[in-house]
Amino acid sequence: SNLDDIPSPYLEGVLDEFFDVEYLIPITETMRGCPFKCTFCATGSFNTSHKLHHQYHKEIRYLLEDLEFSNLVFRDPTFFLKASVVMDCAELINDIGNKKWKGQARGTFHRQYTPEQFKFMRKSGLTSVMFGVESGSQRMLDLMIKKVKREDYIKSAEVLRDLGVEMYASFMFAMPNENVDDLKESLDLMRQLKKINPNILLQNCIFLPLPATVENPA
């Protein structure tokens, strides 16, 4: 269904009484679903649906201007995949001024934007980019159908380091078919990313066979 047909809980004001501008960071989205079909993830089993330009503009302005939040998180599973939307949001946040924002990207982040676009995102307030790395083993990445190369994460880490933007990298262990060599490659990639940027945030997760995924189709 069209996301614009669903009333925004922000714009309807139903969440206002729960907001604490000093301690909370609001989450918004420009789309739902994911065009990729990673074997462990249920998000890819849903069709993608995008909000129209004017809808997410209203929400961003409401949160950052009307409620005066200083931070914003874009929770789209692959927010940075659509450069036109990302740059549109960056321009809006830059116009509002003195705000910070973050979002989730794929490993291919480093080759999806020009150097000028990267710099503008940083100027507009981009402070952190989150990656679901999952594994440092190319064999495992291929089995997961991640459609990304191990080296992509290294190059993205270098781009973020040069921009002065935080990198948040999540790894997943105990996947089906994972062996000791795969595990060692994941640990090695963690060390490489840490060497590139000592301030990187690393998260370790244990595989959970979610329903409606390739790993658990029930």
Question: What are these model-derived regions, one by one?
Answer:
Residues S1-L3, A212:
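Glycine-rich beta-alpha loop elements in corrinoid/cobalamin-binding modules
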Residues R191-N197:
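Basic phosphate/pyrophosphate-binding loop/patch that engages nucleotide-derived ligands
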Residues F36, A83-S84, R139, L143-M144, ...:
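Flexible glycine/acidic-rich beta-alpha junction loops that bind and position SAM and/or redox cofactors
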Residues S156-V159, L189, I206:
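Generic recognition of well-ordered alpha-helical segments
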Residues P9-M167:
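Radical SAM [4Fe-4S] cluster-binding motif and immediate context
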Residues G103, A169-F171, N204:
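Structural beta-sheet core signal
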Residues N177-R191:
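Catalytic cores of alpha/beta
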